Amino acid sequence: MECADYFIGSGRRCSPSTSTSTSREAWRPEKQWRKATNVIRGCHRLLRLGVLSAAAGIMRRNPSYVEIKVHDEGELDVSSGGDGEAPVAFTVAADDESFKGLVKNKREDCFRLLGGGAGVAAVLASGAERGIRGDDADVARRKKAFGSNTYPKPKPKGFFRHVWDALADVFLIVLLVCAAVSLAFGIKEHGIKDGWYDGVSIFLAVFLVAAVSAVSNHSQGKRFDKLARESENIMVSVVRAARRQEVSIFDVVVGDVVVLKIGDVVPADGVFLDGHALQVDESSMTGEPHPVEVDAVKSPFLASGVKVVDGYGKMVVTAVGTDTAWGEMMRTITRENTDPTPLQERLEGLTSSIGKVGIAVAVLVFAVLTARHFTGSTRDEQGNALFDKRNVTFNAVFSGLVGIFQQAVTIIVVAIPEGLPLAVTLTLAFSMKRMVRENALVRRLSACETMGSVTAICTDKTGTLTLNQMKVTEFWVGADRPRSAAAVNGGVVRLLCQGAGLNTTGSVYKPDNVSPPEITGSPTEKALLSWAVEELPMDADALKRKCKVVRVEAFNSDKKRSGVMLRDAATGAVTAHWKGAAEMVLARCTVYVGADGAARELGVEQRRKLEQVINDMAAASLRCIAFAYKQVVDGGDSDNAKIDDEGLTLLGFVGLKDPCRPEVKSAIEACTKAGIAVKMVTGDNVLTARAIAKECGIISGNDDDAAGVVIEGHEFRAMSEQEQLAIVDNIRVMARSLPLDKLVLVQRLKQKGHVVAVTGDGTNDAPALKEADVGLSMGVQGTEVAKESSDIVILNDNFDTVVTATRWGRCVYNNIQKFIQFQLTVNVAALVINFVSAVTTGRMPLTTVQLLWVNLIMDTMGALALATDTPTAGLMRRPPIGRAAPLISNAMWRNLAAQAAYQVAVLLALQYRGFGGAGAGERANGTMIFNAFVLCQVFNEFNAREIERRNVFAGVHRNRMFLGIVAVTVALQVVMVELLTKFAGTERLGWGQWGACVGIAAVSWPIGWAVKCIPVPERPFHEIITARRRRRRST
């Protein structure tokens, strides 16, 4: 695309249209006419350059255009922006592609022809101070012309794809083949009227299992997709109608003026408008790790997806969505993230081991049944041999083998606990959905599991332990504490207004003289600006007109201060202002001013008194901020000059109060009871940090005197690695810390065997968030870089939500253990019953359809029932579960063995002795065994709800899902036994037989209660056995 295309819009014409109204002719702004004239002159220049012919060719091929209309000022209800120009309306007659390649292809020549960033903004009916109009109609027109800021996502699996995946299981395929063979032989032997039952029954059973699995997977997939969309919906700061506001990244449109600060991710392609020391990390696009400085001359382009690492600025959006370089790359990505979580990987190993046992049993059963069948030992209900050795035919041999093979394969299907991965998916999906309701958005699935094993939490103070509702409660000018600003010299007040109102990333917007001002920015900036507006008082608009910002040094956690250089519009005098941590700023001051405006030398005694003022504020849990300034002699003309921060004049201090959250003390107590150490890592003064830690309950009066409990960052940095390892467990508070200190603290804790969770909100917290086992970013104050580096986003910035996430992490692990115990009980009982019965009687008590039904209720229904339990209070009264802890605990082995032994004993007794006397037939007896076995699993679901506690009914009334699944299972079992007799191979039972089945199943409750009275060692059984073997060998 030629440069002309950008100006005339790929054959589109820029046509200034004027109003014909004469009533407003007298006050039409001249700048609007000047803009229209500049557009026309630009077109004439392009004619002279000889490029219009190419543009005309494009115009003939594509006659659509963008039309910029300059309206009368009175026609718009938007006030003029600070750039002195009235907003212009943006009208689009057709699709436009003028700006799509400007940033993607880095067309600097076209950028210059358009007049730089301001020219691009003007063509897009926008401006640095006013932005776009931003009403619904304007946004809709821009979306229609340039598209929306969204990327195509890989199409999620449809329901039938899930069905297909479920049917792709090799053992289900074998069963389908066996069903087809059985159907063919059945029809051949018994005719189509009676011969289709067995084959079709197996077909239906297999498809039912696949359908239920598909429904579950499909619903969980949709839930995960919804959570993924929520995690991608970040808020972006834009200027619309001369007001700064937050909009969804999906609502950013071409022409929007985006405000960028440290930690932001650039939401779309755009060009630089204005700013100071703006640097971005383009490694996501180019792979280069070094920051790139962005300015209006050398590097004006900002690509979607890059991260701001320093400074701040504004950009005008030129392309969105798939028209950006990032969007083009995202369009090519179609692979879904299917990486298993650590728990899923461990469960796959367990499933594989159990599957091998099942296959071995199935092979033995096949061998035994084959031998008994072809020796004539297997007989039907009338006592006749199923295989007649005297009349051997191919059909008889093949049919017999298929039937036996079908039963053996069914044993494998039942034995392999395929419900374990489903249970993990279900409990993760359920937990993630509930966690979002409780303000914890999970970005990585593995974090859900890992939170259950956390032993140490390194948390920030501001906004996490405190309310983040800062307010100035103390004000000092030098060593004086005036009652109000009226008692302070006017020159000092003017300098304080400059320091508070212009050395800031916040903003003050006053829509009219009646409404209160709207203040935006970080909580600290908002508190300082509110104080300046209300107390000094400060006129933000007048201040911006009187002073021009020459240079800015943004605040970062290393310097703990920010600076700005201002030039007075009237006199040309240049002043440097600094604001930041009081002791840091005071250390660079040599002079201070009093309330009377007189400057005094800062001697040793006076410095000590001012330090005491700072300490008194800190001891009162106040954050102390100092203001200082310096007259710049050289005028700050050098482009690369740093703002001088030596020999400053102290203006004063303000103390900001940020109260602790009312619920944080109980949350920290809960962590202590749960065996989790809470460590506060803050950049605040050590006295402030200690006071807040005592208020929150992180340290007590006794702890305060212990060595290393409260430490400053520089002390920790000065230690050797061995010294750090020796003290790291004792640390409860680290004050005046740097992001590097937090990173090292996490590393040392992990070296000591801790599972570490870290909270963070700044860009510099990203390394610690990534290093931690679980990184938790703040959703309100956290930067986008911090959120991208984290595993969980705390949506309300509240420490109590961190504890909630820990509780849910433990619940995930606990629910999985419940299901493992339940399913292995079914697996063991089914394998032993079928194997023993096959060896001793030559037949299996449960048919293929019955076994598939058992597989359905234990794999899917059981997972649904047990994977949706909510956290209990008892979870936070036990120590964390180690990452290396076995999935099956000693208590689970105890419960499993007791229940499986009971089921095997009672069902084998039914198999051998029968029920109901001599009148009961073999089919009725098989139905009793099937019915009792299924009901045993239903009753055992209640036992599985609690692994340690004897009261298995605690809180069951609150779990409607569990009760619903139990009710549905019982209802379907009644249907299977009483109505689908042909399909299930059952016989209708009488009331007495049903009562007997329920009684047999109900005995599992007292057995479960009694067996939990038997103590088991904490140490895993396999470790005890291994240790004993080693001792025997050594002796």
Curated annotation (Swiss-Prot):
Residues 1-166, 216-348, 417-818, 867-887, 941-960, 1012-1035 are cytoplasmic. One of its GO terms (molecular function) is P-type calcium transporter activity. It is a multi-pass membrane protein. GO terms for cellular component: Golgi membrane; intracellular membrane-bounded organelle; plasma membrane. Mg(2+) binds at residues 761, 765. The chain crosses the membrane at residues 167-187, 195-215, 349-369, 396-416, 819-839, 846-866, 888-910, 920-940, 961-981, 991-1011. Keywords: ATP-binding, Calcium, Calcium transport, Calmodulin-binding, Glycoprotein, Golgi apparatus, Ion transport, Magnesium, Membrane, Metal-binding, Nucleotide-binding, Stress response, Translocase, Transmembrane, Transmembrane helix, Transport. InterPro entries: ATPase_P-typ_cation-transptr_C, ATPase_P-typ_cation-transptr_N, ATPase_P-typ_cyto_dom_N, ATPase_P-typ_P_site, ATPase_P-typ_TM_dom_sf, ATPase_P-typ_transduc_dom_A_sf, HAD-like_sf, HAD_sf. Gene3D superfamilies: Calcium-transporting ATPase, cytoplasmic domain N, Calcium-transporting ATPase, cytoplasmic transduction domain A, Calcium-transporting ATPase, transmembrane domain, HAD superfamily/HAD-like. Glycans are attached at residue 391. Activated by calmodulin. SUPFAM superfamilies: Calcium ATPase, transduction domain A (SSF81653), Calcium ATPase, transmembrane domain M (SSF81665), HAD-like (SSF56784), Metal cation-transporting ATPase, ATP-binding domain N (SSF81660). It is found in: Golgi apparatus membrane. It is an enzyme of class 7 (translocase). It catalyses: Ca(2+)(in) + ATP + H2O = Ca(2+)(out) + ADP + phosphate + H(+). Its EC number is 7.2.2.10. Pfam families: Cation_ATPase_C, Cation_ATPase_N, E1-E2_ATPase, Hydrolase. Belongs to the cation transport ATPase (P-type) (TC 3.A.3) family. Type IIB subfamily. The N-terminus contains an autoinhibitory calmodulin-binding domain, which binds calmodulin in a calcium-dependent fashion. This is Calcium-transporting ATPase 7, plasma membrane-type. It comes from Oryza sativa subsp. japonica (Rice). The gene is ACA7.
